[in-house]
Amino acid sequence: MDRMKKIKRQLSMTLRGGRGIDKTNGAPEQIGLDESGGGGGSDPGEAPTRAAPGELRSARGPLSSAPEIVHEDLKMGSDGESDQASATSSDEVQSPVRVRMRNHPPRKISTEDINKRLSLPADIRLPEGYLEKLTLNSPIFDKPLSRRLRRVSLSEIGFGKLETYIKLDKLGEGTYATVYKGKSKLTDNLVALKEIRLEHEEGAPCTAIREVSLLKDLKHANIVTLHDIIHTEKSLTLVFEYLDKDLKQYLDDCGNIINMHNVKLFLFQLLRGLAYCHRQKVLHRDLKPQNLLINERGELKLADFGLARAKSIPTKTYSNEVVTLWYRPPDILLGSTDYSTQIDMWGVGCIFYEMATGRPLFPGSTVEEQLHFIFRILGTPTEETWPGILSNEEFKTYNYPKYRAEALLSHAPRLDSDGADLLTKLLQFEGRNRISAEDAMKHPFFLSLGERIHKLPDTTSIFALKEIQLQKEASLRSSSMPDSGRPAFRVVDTEF
């Protein structure tokens, strides 16, 4: 009995002395008693004995960010028992030791942390004091970010607020919307502000809703970026990245003669953005030079997704302007509603030809005239070239002359044999026979661009490769107001 009291007294003195517990491999050392009564660390080969109450602390790995749990030390008497009254008798199980949370100093949060977590532009300028505020409330960076928290965080930065953007020049106006050139206070970058009025009884145009729903999920270097959405009682404002001009304006500025190397770069980027859309099961369905935006670096981006996934392709816009037929495939012109990714590939072929020659391939003003232009160059279809065409009521109504197909190379002499072959594969009567965007990128026409261009991540520009450079145009005008009278800055869908 005296021997046990001596052991308890020694243990009590140790605890009162505040001797810390060494940590090995992130776990506390166990204190035990051997047969001789001496206190010491347990051998790794032995089973650990009961730990002394009030001394053990939870181990925390060096990289853990969870708050540390600390068992509260109890005052111990000379016999090794607690001086505090116990609610249990000696033959009952002792209650668990009370715990308290140890608060660690808040983790420093960087601008890079915020940009990565909230998917912000790298050049964003955060409001003064925002970093400090987040540092005090950093748990949102220690756990998955809910949609509500992300929305609140973006709002605090300035997203979703009209006052974050400065309107500069008016670029276009339609029945439902006005488009402005603007500037972001967050980045100092130029933006395009598409302000859609909601005072109409039917609310926001379905094209705008469709465009928003698609673009917020499409992240690609060759697709225009939707930066922000601002919804008020009277308007819906879409904030897009701002690009210098569209392909039509680029053609105008070049005197309709684009360097063939640049034609190849523009076509590859068009196919690259389109292939990404098609992988996402999205059809553009309104490809034309005015919907392809180009910046000073030569980056081409698909814009205006207002008709994507539409149940039908209208002949007029919201401002009652006629939608151009020049880039519409013959199967759609003849009433087909069997939409697939090949619907876009015909338009790619027409745009390819226009870049190579400086003029539209099929400039019809009515459906009948448009088909006439197509058949005069590609030949009037027969049952052999287009099975089932003779039973098409629309086709029979027009009663076209029997044209023979002409060589495309004779109409586009600047194309080499590979270019003419690719153009032929794009301009097939039946959609199922047209080459896909993915396969077109692998066509021999693009061999000179090298292999690395096919291995880039979706969000990386082709101009990130040192071997890819836009060549200087022989007659490029730098005027901000082309002869057509339109500003040399194209934004997304100025037609409504």
Curated annotation (Swiss-Prot):
Residues 83-93 have a biased composition (Polar residues). Phosphorylation of CDK16 is essential for the binding of CCNY, but also essential for the regulation of CDK16 kinase activity. Phosphorylation of CDK16 is essential for the binding of CCNYl1, but also essential for the regulation of CDK16 kinase activity. Ser-146 and Ser-153 are the most critical sites for the binding of CCNYL1 and for modulating CDK16 kinase activity. Phosphorylation at Ser-153 inhibits kinase activity. InterPro entries: CDK (IPR050108), Kinase-like_dom_sf (IPR011009), Prot_kinase_dom (IPR000719), Protein_kinase_ATP_BS (IPR017441), Ser/Thr_kinase_AS (IPR008271). It is found in: Cytoplasm; Cytoplasmic vesicle, Secretory vesicle; Cell membrane; Synapse, Synaptosome. Detected in pancreas islets (at protein level). Detected in brain and pancreas. The active site is at D286. Residues 165-446 form the Protein kinase domain. This is Cyclin-dependent kinase 16.
